[in-house]
């Protein structure tokens, strides 16, 4: 039996275990920076397999994290994670939202290959009707308001499957494997903190993936790459003014409503960029306490996007100038908190070709006709990919194809779990091709 056949056989034999692990992660869904139970279990399993394991502040640079919840909420989640069966040795490292995990396998001289598996859930209420398979079969989320509605329970499980297979063939590998289990992908808040801690420095190959829906009759199991992911920046903006009686002494006040209104109108008037697509959106505004009170505080949530990192930077700089100027114009002040960010991405041609060749010729898995899939949203794996490519390395973000129930980010989302062993085969086959 050659190594590719070993990879396929082992992946298929662990299908039941992969399904069980995915369902466990699904049942105990934890969103970004709350993945304390999830991370502790991943760290335990990697340790038992024999990996060198990094946790806590070894993984994420604390000050580079974005959109981190309050200390009070983090402590509440920590207590829940412990109560729900978090590993007692490793959960302590997740305190304060330090929920990344990296497993390292050193196999002598050779290239360094990193793989990213995101692990966070979403703030979604999962469907309880028996028509929803997780509800029917007893693994829907017990954490009300949190749900794996984007497949990251599957991604984390795939990473653990990859870890097991690669450890079993380590004698055939030359180089270093890094398995990066990333928190807080939703809201593009987590990847930069891992890059800023140096974990992509010196990496020669970077591979990420996402489960993606396919047509019912499509036999393909993978699209080798992605392009078109929009660079993005997200801010929470707080305007501060001065309250006053709206009828008796309005001139005494400093009305944040005027500052917010001026900012919104001018944000949507930012000139478009000739270099490509740009986006701006004001998603929420919360302000005011009564009809006869000059509002003294307002919160606004905004985002800008660009087809390239440069266009996004143009949009961001324009937006910051507008917001600060609108506040000043009406005698108010403002503070802006960065809540998430991502760069644009494009998969390396050579690595996409390698994925296609390995799948078709060695693993005998059908590949989609298109080499690369357009990603209309934003993905912070871009920070990792760009860092590797800037160093002269190769990176790709694959689409691992499956049949999905319900649209992504919906309360009825689910995946066909056959995608789990399929993805393990693809990752391990490509890594072996690079490192043997």
Where are these predicted regions, by residue range?
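Acidic/His- and Gly-rich active-site-bordering loop/insert found
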Residues: 3-147, 161, 172-173
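Short Gly/Pro-enriched turn/cap motifs at secondary-structure boundaries
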Residues: 90-94, 185, 225-229, 372-376
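Metal-dependent amide/peptide-bond hydrolase catalytic core
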Residues: 258-436
């Amino acid at each position: 039996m050659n190594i590719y056949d070993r990879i396929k056989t082992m992946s298929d034999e662990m299908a039941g275990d992969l399904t069980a692990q995915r369902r466990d992660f699904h049942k105990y869904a934890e969103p970004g920076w709350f993945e304390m139970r999830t991370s502790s279990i991943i760290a335990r399993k990697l340790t038992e397999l024999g990996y060198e394991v990094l946790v806590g502040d070894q993984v994420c640079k604390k000050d580079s994290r974005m959109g981190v919840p309050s200390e009070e909420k983090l402590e509440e989640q920590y207590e829940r994670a412990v109560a729900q069966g978090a590993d007692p040795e490793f959960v302590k490292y997740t305190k304060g939202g330090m929920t990344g995990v990296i497993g390292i396998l050193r196999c002598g001289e050779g290239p360094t290959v990193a793989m990213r598996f995101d692990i966070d859930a979403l703030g979604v209420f999962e469907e309880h009707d028996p028509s929803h398979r997780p509800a029917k079969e007893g693994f829907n989320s017990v954490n009300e308001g949190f749900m794996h509605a984007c497949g990251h329970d599957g991604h984390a499980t795939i990473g653990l499957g990859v870890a097991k297979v690669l450890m079993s063939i380590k004698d055939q590998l030359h180089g270093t494997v890094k398995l990066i289990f990333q928190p807080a992908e939703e809201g593009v808040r987590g990847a930069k903190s891992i890059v800023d801690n140096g974990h992509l420095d010196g990496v020669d190959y970077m591979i990420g993936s996402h489960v993606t829906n396919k047509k019912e009759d499509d036999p393909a199991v993978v699209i080798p790459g992605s392009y078109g992911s929009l660079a993005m920046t997200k801010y929470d903006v707080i305007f501060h003014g001065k309250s006053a009686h709206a009828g008796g002494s309005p001139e005494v006040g400093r009305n944040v409503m005027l500052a917010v209104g001026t900012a919104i109108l001018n944000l949507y008037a930012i000139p478009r960029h000739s270099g490509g697509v740009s986006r701006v959106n004001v998603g929420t505004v919360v302000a005011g306490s009564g009809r006869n009170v000059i509002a003294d505080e307002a919160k606004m949530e905004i985002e800008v996007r660009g087809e390239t990192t440069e266009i996004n930077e143009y949009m961001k700089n324009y937006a910051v100038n507008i917001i600060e100027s609108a506040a000043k114009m009406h005698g108010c002040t403002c503070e802006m908190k960065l809540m998430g960010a991502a760069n644009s991405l494009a998969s390396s041609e050579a690595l996409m070709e390698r994925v296609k060749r390995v799948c078709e010729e060695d693993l005998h898995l059908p590949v989609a006709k298109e080499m690369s899939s357009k990603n209309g949203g934003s993905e912070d794996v871009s920070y990792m990919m760009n860092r590797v490519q800037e160093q002269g390395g190769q990176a790709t973000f694959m689409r691992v194809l499956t049949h999905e129930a319900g649209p992504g980010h919906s309360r009825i989302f689910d995946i066909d779990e056959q995608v789990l062993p399929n993805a393990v085969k693809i990752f391990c086959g490509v890594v072996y091709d690079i490192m043997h």
